[in-house]
Amino acid sequence: DLLDYGRGILSAPESAKMKTAYIAAPLVGSIYCGSPEEEEENVEEYVSLPVSLFGKGDFYILRAKGDSMVDAGIAEGNLLVIERNCPASEGDIVVALDQEQQNTLKRYVGFDNDEKCFILAYENEARYPEEVIKLKSFEVQGVARHVIKAL
């Protein structure tokens, strides 16, 4: 039986055996998936993330704005689980802070030795074919690890 009502106490014996660890990740606002925009970080709430699904890490959550990352599976309103304090590798989707203190969510392509700049790419071929952002320098504020969305 999944549920037991013995001695007037409702219990679920199988679920009692499961011990799920959670980490609390702050939902700190939104991030534009288009051109860099200035955003403030304000904790709206904390979200419990099961370690068995998300792993351990220093995570925070952002709400996606815009449509420039739809080909990467990120749509307007999706929640993004971002790992902070980790290095970005080529191909990662990053929260990038530019020299003007504006941030955006883009795919990190790498460094262009000819133009001496970092390349961040849009992921919406239909609307932004081959469009990129070129930056002399930027700070990686985190790497996107998971997308949470409603079906």
Where are these regions (language model features)?
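Short coil-to-beta transition motif at edge beta-strands of beta-rich domains
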Residues: 88-95
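Short, positionally conserved secondary-structure boundary motifs
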Residues: 1-70, 75, 90, 101-103, ...
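Catalytic Cys-His active-site segments of thiol-dependent hydrolases/isopeptidases
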Residues: 115-125
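Glycine-centered tight beta-turn/hairpin loop motif at sheet-sheet or coil-to-beta transitions
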Residues: 100-101, 125
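Conserved PDZ fold ligand-binding element
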Residues: 76-84
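Flexible glycine-/small-residue-rich
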Residues: 29, 98, 122
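Hydrophobic beta-strand signal
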Residues: 61, 81-82, 95
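Low-complexity, intrinsically disordered Gly/Pro/Thr-rich segments
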Residues: 123-135
